[in-house]
Regions:
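Short glycine-enriched, charge-decorated loop/helix-capping segments at active-site entrances
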Residues: 92-95, 99-100, 187-192
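Conserved AdoMet/S-adenosylmethionine-binding subsite of the radical SAM
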Residues: 107-265, 272
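Glycine-centered loop/turn positions within well-structured domains
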Residues: 31, 83, 183
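Conserved, mostly hydrophobic/aromatic
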Residues: 85, 176, 281
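Long, charge-rich boundary regions
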Residues: 46-93, 115-118, 122, 126-129, ...
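N-terminal [4Fe-4S]-dependent radical SAM core
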Residues: 1-78, 91-95, 292, 302-305
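Auxiliary Fe-S-binding modules of radical SAM enzymes
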Residues: 1-28, 221-335
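Short cysteine/histidine-rich metal-coordination sites, predominantly Zn2+-binding motifs
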Residues: 32-42, 47-54, 98-110, 310-322, ...
């Protein structure tokens, strides 16, 4: 347990300013996520260093396709979430409140493990990492000192204050999950404002953080042409045509029983992304598909071929297409 970094005292109550819910907690009360509590007028986090999952993952699994491809990130997750999505693929930890006594991992021990496992960076993921803000900040500072990169895989519903803390501490890349348009997000994810997610992505990008966007394409939720066009056009218009968009396949999980995303729907999402002017659109959870690869937007040359989460061909020289010399946006090279 640690005192939270972003809080506002309110005559015995306390407001949490980590995520955009900005919960106001009465004495003894918990926030929506159940990971923060008002104890004696002070906001405390109940999951500092409480690790539910730990794995050395290919960076492609996040997914990041334009950020140190072929490297590995030691990935840690904790408990709970600030969204209520009924299809959550990691529901076993995101829908669980923090245990009274969990496995504690200090930031320094985590960084020691990064080196021991041969990873080149860190990733806070699996559940919503914003809930682990205090731990993330310490991890990022130590990682930066040791020459490791730092990444977040997030639903993006973080406050500008939280974003700034993370960036100032060493956050280098963020994959933001855009779940749909405003009506679908409010209906399925428990009254959240999707514009705040876009704002977080724009803020991070303006501060030099590498951004990639992921959309889990779910039948009858966000798979209409209207919704997909809206997402693709906002990426192009608000973040930039060069920002990668991953349209990934959904599989039934937790309380959602809709059938898996048809390949035809995913390929339509790819086409919609290209029609919106996006230079890099990828299909996820479909290993071996040609749209899982990176192509030069100028000459069409295959630049990076992937099989699952493995890079099997790499044809970039100093971040440029070997065929035509076109500079490919991203963070390249080996760590």
């Amino acid at each position: 347990m640690r005192e939270a970094l972003l809080q506002e005292a309110m005559d015995g109550r306390v407001r949490c300013n980590a995520c955009e819910r900005r919960c106001t907690l009465i004495p003894g009360g918990f926030g929506w996520c159940r990971t923060r509590q008002n104890r004696g007028g002070k906001l405390v986090t109940l999951i500092y260093g409480s690790v539910s999952s730990l794995a050395a993952n290919p960076i492609e699994k996040k997914p990041f396709y334009h950020f140190y491809p072929g490297t590995k990130a030691l990935t840690a997750g904790s408990w709970s979430c600030n969204f209520g999505c009924p299809w959550c693929q990691n529901w076993d930890i995101s829908k669980s409140p923090p245990p009274a006594k969990g496995d504690y991992l200090s930031p320094q021990r985590f960084i020691d493990s990064v080196e021991r496992t041969g990873c080149q960076g860190t990733s806070i993921s699996f559940n919503e990492p914003t809930l682990s803000l205090e731990w993330s900040v310490e991890v990022f500072r130590l990682a930066k000192q040791s020459g490791f990169y730092n990444t977040y895989v997030t639903n993006g519903y973080m406050t500008p204050e939280a974003s700034s803390l993370l960036i100032n501490s060493g956050l280098e890349a963020m994959n933001v999950d855009i779940k749909g348009d405003a009506p679908s997000v409010k209906k399925f994810c428990k009254m959240v404002d999707v514009d705040r997610v876009w704002a977080a992505a724009k803020l991070a990008r303006s501060r030099g953080v590498h951004i990639e966007i992921t959309t889990l394409v779910i039948p009858a939720v966000n798979d209409s042409d209207l919704v997909l066009h809206g997402i693709a056009e906002r990426i192009a218009g608000e973040l930039g045509r060069e920002v990668p968009w991953h349209a990934t396949s959904y599989f039934p999980a937790y309380h959602f029983t809709a059938p898996p995303t048809p390949m035809q729907t995913l390929e339509r999402a790819w086409q919609i992304g290209k029609e919106a002017g996006l230079e890099f659109v990828y299909l996820g959870n479909v290993a071996g598909h040609r749209y899982d690869n990176t192509y030069c937007p100028a000459c069409g040359t295959l630049l990076i071929r992937r099989l699952g989460f493995e890079v099997v061909e790499y044809r970039l020289d100093a971040g440029k297409c070997r065929q035509c010399g076109r500079s490919i946006p991203g963070v390249w090279g080996n760590r």
